[in-house]
Amino acid sequence: MARGCLCCVKYMLFLFNLLFWLGGCGLLGVGVWLSVSQGSFATLSPSFPSISAANLIITLGAVIMVTGFLGCLGAIKENKCLLLSFFITLLVILLAELILLILFFVYTDNVSENARQDLKEGLALYSTNNNAGLRNAWNTIQTEWHCCGVNGYTDWHTALQEKVVPDHCCQDIYQDCGRNATNQFWTRGCYEKVEEWLDDNKHLLGTIAMCVLVIQLLGMAFSMTLYQQIHRSGKKYEA
């Protein structure tokens, strides 16, 4: 009976982490593709040039892959050392998420103001060489979200040092439309649009966050259950 419970928990944990590992592989592949094909894709912040969409996805994918690998190997080998490492890894990730969340809510105003200022400074890189990723990111954001600049279209006047905006700020996009009358531009800033979108989708984002939390807690519960089952059965892990 005990052995049957052990096998059940073992294979549940293995399948759980196999899906986890495959998801990490997928994210890592997407991150590498973005890095190779788009360069510094979506590197909107000049203060943190390494924080790009590609690098964030690669880092996230690598962490998920390593965590999933520890869980898979620990489960299939019934190795207490690996299972404990898996549990500790998930616990550290969970604590880091909670700390970041608390800091974000405590310093929301400071984070928001610094983000606005940093993004405005990043607009100056729009027309520079080797920043195709940044240009593509801003062009996509302004076209899809019907916005212009960080706080408004005048941000571009300061950044580009002349009274023009990128053509993707125009309500009807055509060559050099950014040099025409301002009544043809989207007037709302993109930062405001993003804040509005986050507010409109806060319930969806909260649900996703809860799902991630449940997955982490399940992984920790499965690993500790299997660890205890192995410990009680007296099985020694291999060095």
Curated annotation (Swiss-Prot):
Glycans are attached at N110, N180. Residues 1-12, 77-85, 225-239 are cytoplasmic. Signal peptide: none annotated. The chain crosses the membrane at residues 13-33, 56-76, 86-106, 204-224. PROSITE patterns: TM4_1. Pfam families: Tetraspanin (PF00335). GO terms for cellular component: plasma membrane. Residues 34-55, 107-203 are extracellular. The keyword Transmembrane applies. This is Tetraspanin-9. Belongs to the tetraspanin (TM4SF) family. Keywords: Glycoprotein, Membrane, Transmembrane, Transmembrane helix. It comes from Salmo salar. It is a multi-pass membrane protein. CDD domains: NET-5_like_LEL (cd03165). It is found in: Membrane. Its main location: membrane.
